[in-house]
């Protein structure tokens, strides 16, 4: 096993995975048929003492793909008007191309091997991002095709809460319900929450793992 002093790097913490926090806002629940309307991504970094923290942020409003379903209930829930020109929306290709480029650079700079999505109820966000990447014919997808870090599950374990707002409050963080269901705000809160859970485990002595003793 590596010496503990060598386990403070991001590449050592998650088996070579590079965690990237993602949140999406959509026009429904079906990743294949319903529109992706907004996406934000935040990369993470570690300081020299091994504490995890947010790093770089990208955020895009996204144009519905041709033929996409726009479920009225979903639009009422997130308050997005896809036809509003003030959104400054870009294509799925433009949004994901920029995010993937940022992520690939982070993987290289940190010495990691592949990105892993961090999200709250991650299956949902992962399915929409992967479906959009497929529609956009983006071949160099840096994210693992199925492995994720789900902060809903991690929060249930560490904090006894699974709802994002309640988990943030349980962790001693602020959460503004008026800003919820914005991809940018939810991603920022999820990033801070994930870092707090990882860092709390370190403060409690759970990381680095103890070195094996000779018998």
Curated annotation (Swiss-Prot):
Entry's InterPro entries?
Answer: Exonuclease_RNaseT/DNA_pol3, RNase_T, RNaseH-like_sf, RNaseH_sf
Q: Give binding positions for Mg(2+) 1.
A: 23
| Alphabetical UniProt keywords | Exonuclease, Hydrolase, Magnesium, Metal-binding, Nuclease, tRNA processing
Reported EC number(s) for this entry are 3.1.13.-
| Gene Ontology terms for molecular function | 3'-5' exonuclease activity; magnesium ion binding; nucleic acid binding; RNA exonuclease activity, producing 5'-phosphomonoesters
Entry note: cofactor? Binds two Mg(2+) per subunit. The active form of the enzyme binds two Mg(2+) ions in its active site. The first Mg(2+) forms only one salt bridge with the protein.
Which parts of the sequence bind Mg(2+) 2?
A: 23, 25, 181, 186
Gene3D superfamilies per UniProt: Ribonuclease H-like superfamily/Ribonuclease H
Query: Enzyme class, one word?
Result: hydrolase
Q: Which domain of life is it from?
A: Bacteria
Q: Positions of the site: Important for substrate binding and specificity?
A: 29, 77, 124, 146
Q: Which GO terms describe its biological process?
A: DNA replication proofreading; tRNA processing
Please list the residue ranges annotated as the Exonuclease domain: 20-194
Active site (catalytic residues): 181
**What's the cofactor?**
Mg(2+)
The function of this protein is: Trims short 3' overhangs of a variety of RNA species, leaving a one or two nucleotide 3' overhang. Responsible for the end-turnover of tRNA: specifically removes the terminal AMP residue from uncharged tRNA (tRNA-C-C-A). Also appears to be involved in tRNA biosynthesis.
Task: Give the similarity note.
Answer: Belongs to the RNase T family.
What is annotated about its quaternary structure and interactions? Homodimer.
What is the name listed in the Swiss-Prot or TrEMBL entry for this protein? Ribonuclease T
- According to its UniProt entry, this protein's organism is Salmonella choleraesuis (strain SC-B67)
